[in-house]
A protein has these predicted regions:
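Bacterial N-terminal signal peptides that target proteins for export
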Residues: 1-13
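Exposed boundary/loop context
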Residues: 4, 21-22, 69
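C-terminal segment of classical bacterial N-terminal signal peptides
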Residues: 14-25
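Small-residue-enriched, tightly packed secondary-structure blocks
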Residues: 27-185
Length: 185
C-alpha cells in the first residue's frame, strides 16, 4: 500500500512538473514575444488600476510577469517569465518559479507586477542570485480597496505588488515562496 502511494505521488509530481515546464515556451534567446506581452500587460493593468498608474510614476522599477501558469493536484507548481522595466526600458529578464504541496487541485493563469519604490529594494533584486519572495524587502499586495488609498506620500519604500488577470480554477493565488531568478537570454 505504501509503495502504491509513493508511486502515485511521484506520478503526480512528474505530471505537475511537466505541465509547468512545458505550458509556456522558454525565452530561448528571443525576447521579442516577451517584450510584447509585457507591454500589453502593463497597458491592461494601468487601464484597470489607477493605483498602479500612481505607483508607476514614483517607482524606481517595475518587474512584470505577464503570464504565470499554476497547476496542482496535491503537489503543485507555477512558472512564468517577465521583464524588469526601468525608465520605460527593459533592463533584464526574469523567471518566477514556485512549488507547493497540500490540499490543492486545478490550473490557473495570472500575471503580476511588482513596483520597486526605493533603491534598496531594487538593489536587493539585482544583487541576489535568486530572490525568494517573503525573504528580503517587504512586499505590500495591493487590492482594490487599498488601491483607492494609495498616495505618493504613503509609497516611499518597499515593493507594491498587483496580481491581475486570473483565469482558471484554483483556490487562492499567492506569491509567498516564489523564487525570482535573472535570465540570461
Amino acid at each position: 500500500m505504501r509503495t502504491m502511494i509513493r508511486l502515485l505521488l511521484v506520478a503526480m509530481m512528474l505530471t505537475v512538473f511537466t505541465a509547468v515546464c512545458f505550458t509556456q515556451p522558454a525565452m530561448a534567446g528571443d525576447t521579442t514575444k516577451l517584450d510584447r506581452a509585457v507591454d500589453k500587460a502593463l497597458k491592461k493593468l494601468y487601464a484597470k488600476s489607477p493605483a498602479a498608474v500612481k505607483l508607476s510614476r514614483e517607482a524606481k522599477a517595475v518587474l512584470i510577469f505577464p503570464s504565470v501558469t499554476k497547476v496542482g493536484f496535491l503537489v503543485g507548481g507555477q512558472y512564468g517569465e517577465g521583464a524588469l522595466i526601468v525608465d520605460g526600458k527593459t533592463v533584464g529578464y526574469y523567471n518566477t518559479v514556485a512549488g507547493s504541496y497540500g490540499l490543492q487541485a486545478g490550473a490557473q493563469k495570472f500575471g503580476y507586477a511588482m513596483f520597486f519604490m526605493d533603491t534598496a529594494s531594487l538593489e536587493y533584486l539585482n544583487n541576489s542570485s535568486g530572490w525568494e519572495i517573503g525573504v528580503g524587502p517587504s512586499i505590500v499586495f495591493v487590492d482594490e480597496g487599498m488601491g483607492k488609498n494609495i498616495t505618493t506620500s504613503t509609497t516611499k519604500e518597499g515593493i507594491y505588488a498587483f496580481i491581475y488577470g486570473q483565469k482558471g480554477l484554483m483556490a487562492g493565488v499567492g506569491l509567498q515562496g516564489s523564487k525570482i531568478t535573472k535570465l540570461n537570454p
